[in-house]
Swiss-Prot record:
Gene: ctaB
Top-level taxonomic group: Bacteria
One GO cellular component, as annotated: plasma membrane
Keyword Transmembrane attached: yes
Protein topology in the membrane: Multi-pass membrane protein
Oligomeric and partner information: Interacts with CtaA.
E.C. code: 2.5.1.141
The protein's name: Protoheme IX farnesyltransferase
Record's keyword terms, sorted: Cell inner membrane, Cell membrane, Heme biosynthesis, Membrane, Transferase, Transmembrane, Transmembrane helix
Annotated GO MF terms: protoheme IX farnesyltransferase activity
Something else known: Carbon 2 of the heme B porphyrin ring is defined according to the Fischer nomenclature.
Family membership: Belongs to the UbiA prenyltransferase family. Protoheme IX farnesyltransferase subfamily.
PROSITE patterns the UniProt entry points to: UBIA
Catalytic activities: heme b + (2E,6E)-farnesyl diphosphate + H2O = Fe(II)-heme o + diphosphate
Length: 310
């Protein structure tokens, strides 16, 4: 009797697969925060310049995603959450992801510099380098503080948007950077609480893997305690106002409540309800950031009518 083995042949890559390399979900957050940074800056920007600037910031974010998928293909193949990405699934070859990432990086940086200013282009270039090299190639696989330090990569977009409009930085753009930077650890650690097995199987030293869930819960609370007053203080900057203050107080009250609940939970309780509280906190943290930046944008939109700001 002859054994017949059927080998599944990877399908041919389509446009959607190459687009997925750019991490469109992450790109949407980058575009939104960069757009807010650009629109609330105290400078008048021609609509075409603004549109072009956001386009190339988005392209730079996508380039970072493609480079990350190229480098992380080995661990993405192990993790349930990422194994169906184009490279680990065998649909897109690693070299294609690398080539696309490098090409888009060059186009994004050069064109942003030509369309806006060199400072914004330099900041975009540094952001791509920080995410692709400092975070992906170094921090992610070597330290449980990977997302703490690496979180800077995701915090730069509003600064880049601000730089497109003004050609520099300010207290307000630094505040937006700090808001995302301090939000990143509790956001990803809440994910790691219910995805610990994925990270341990892939050999990624997330805090849950190196120090356990109990310590991670304490860190979520600690960062929430640092994030909340920072977020509320933004109401008293040049981009804040009463509307932002109300939104920030409500969101950060909910943030602290959720962080305390996570800190108090024991593993038996969490396993019994399949980490429902942790999953809820993770979902809330996504709305948390969008709503803060939405409130900042609303304050700027109301100012011409004498309603925004103090």
């Amino acid at each position: 009797m002859t054994d017949i083995r059927i080998t599944e042949v990877p399908r041919e890559a389509g446009f959607g697969d190459y687009f997925a390399l750019l991490k469109p979900r992450v790109m949407s957050l980058v575009v939104f925060t960069a757009l807010v940074g650009l629109l609330v800056a105290p400078a008048t920007v021609h609509p075409m310049i603004a549109l072009t600037g956001i386009l190339f910031i988005a392209l730079g974010a996508g380039a970072s995603g493609a480079l990350n998928m190229w480098w992380d293909a080995d661990i993405d193949r192990v993790m349930k959450r990422t194994r169906n990405r184009p490279v680990p699934a065998g649909v897109v070859q690693p070299g294609e992801a690398l080539g696309l990432g490098l090409a888009l990086s060059g186009i994004a940086v050069v064109m942003l510099g030509l369309a806006t200013n060199l400072f914004a282009a330099g900041l975009l270039a540094f952001t791509i380098f920080f995410y692709a090299v400092v975070y992906s190639m170094w921090l992610k696989r070597t330290t449980p503080q990977n997302i703490v330090i690496g979180g800077a990569a995701g915090a730069f977009p509003p600064m880049i948007g601000w730089a497109v409009a003004t050609g520099g930085v300010s207290l307000e753009s630094l505040f937006m950077f700090a808001l995302i930077f301090m939000w990143t650890p509790p956001h990803f650690w809440s994910l790691a609480l219910f995805m610990k097995t994925d990270y341990s199987d892939a050999g990624v030293p997330m805090l849950t893997v190196t120090h356990g869930r109990r310590v991670t819960r304490g860190h979520v609370l600690a960062y929430a305690l640092l994030l909340a007053p920072l977020a509320v203080a933004g109401a008293f900057t040049g981009i804040g106002g009463p509307l932002y203050l109300v939104v920030a107080l409500a969101l950060n009250g909910w943030l602290l409540r959720g962080a305390v609940r996570i800190w108090r939970r024991d593993e038996a309780e969490a396993e019994a309800d399949r980490y429902r509280t942790e999953k809820g906190f993770f979902r809330f943290s996504l709305y948390y950031l969008f709503l803060h930046f939405g409130a900042i944008l609303a304050e700027a939109a109301l100012k011409p009518y004498g309603l925004g700001g103090w």
